[in-house]
From Swiss-Prot:
Residues 68-173 form the Thioredoxin domain. Thiol-disulfide oxidoreductase required for maintaining symplastic permeability in the meristem. Involved in redox regulation of callose deposition, plasmodesmata cell-to-cell communication and meristem maintenance. Residues 1-67 form a transit peptide. This is Thioredoxin M3, chloroplastic. Its main location: plastid. PROSITE patterns: THIOREDOXIN_1 (PS00194), THIOREDOXIN_2 (PS51352). The keyword Oxidoreductase does not apply. One of its GO terms (cellular component) is chloroplast. The lineage of its organism: Eukaryota, Viridiplantae, Streptophyta, Embryophyta, Tracheophyta.
Amino acid sequence: MAISSSSSSICFNPTRFHTARHISSPSRLFPVTSFSPRSLRFSDRRSLLSSSASRLRLSPLCVRDSRAAEVTQRSWEDSVLKSETPVLVEFYTSWCGPCRMVHRIIDEIAGDYAGKLNCYLLNADNDLPVAEEYEIKAVPVVLLFKNGEKRESIMGTMPKEFYISAIERVLNS
């Protein structure tokens, strides 16, 4: 995951937070710089992590604000159906791992197409009626709208170029 240092980034050092030292496995958000826990046997990891003398050294973390806005059932009509600008909506759930990968792609697209395309995220668990209306049975799903009509749908995690080609088809139609 490439971390950008744009003006909308918020950087903080996770070692300032007490919960940061209780990480049980490495993640992309908290890169471990002193050792690789994946190379340790499970018993070694458990004793290492339970030892109060051991401290994981964590590198600073940068988190960028999302460029895609949240849309809800209340704002759906005004934001999506009545929009004069073409709209991209990602349907996701909070527990969906692949949705996080699509979030990053949609975020990049929102920056690349600012002014030409409005990008939104809709939590399908929280706004089930909208998801049911568009027959969303699994997530992630990306729908593209133009003049209030659904023009394209993309199911699953795809490369950025796949989304770009669908967007270009909608913009040129």
